[in-house]
């Protein structure tokens, strides 16, 4: 059995490059979601966010573990910006598949806020998943094909949330 997660945290190239390497992540693709333009493209994606769709094996990596890594590799305290990229396309967002994912997302955001690991309050949006418009082939696995390409996503050493007593998410 597999599950799906959809996350937005700035330019999708860097997000995909780091997340696809996580054990238990089976497949990723980048695209656009959360906006108003049908059949979104790189040149015409309206109010959509650049996002990554993740297919994962929940017996190998939990949804909360994906979210914790997501919060480690991008700045969730800056609205509509990651690195040099500015605008609503680069916002931080979690698009949940069901009420359980929504609950886990909201709890994880509260834990990130309480941890003090980011200097500002988390501004990550939590919204229901809608249509996901796949980006063109030139954007898929971009940093795998062009390893010297642009990214503003990096794992932050030592950045981990305190372990929860009741794991299982």
UniProtKB/Swiss-Prot annotation:
Task: Give the main EC class.
Answer: oxidoreductase
HAMAP family annotated for this entry? MsrA
In terms of InterPro entries, this protein maps to: Met_Sox_Rdtase_MsrA_dom, Met_Sox_Rdtase_MsrA_sf
Function, in words: Has an important function as a repair enzyme for proteins that have been inactivated by oxidation. Catalyzes the reversible oxidation-reduction of methionine sulfoxide in proteins to methionine.
Q: Per UniProt, what is the name of the gene that codes for the protein in this document?
A: msrA
State the active site.
11
Which organism's genome codes for this protein? Leifsonia xyli subsp. xyli (strain CTCB07)
Q: What is this protein called?
A: Peptide methionine sulfoxide reductase MsrA
What sections of the protein cross the membrane?
A: none
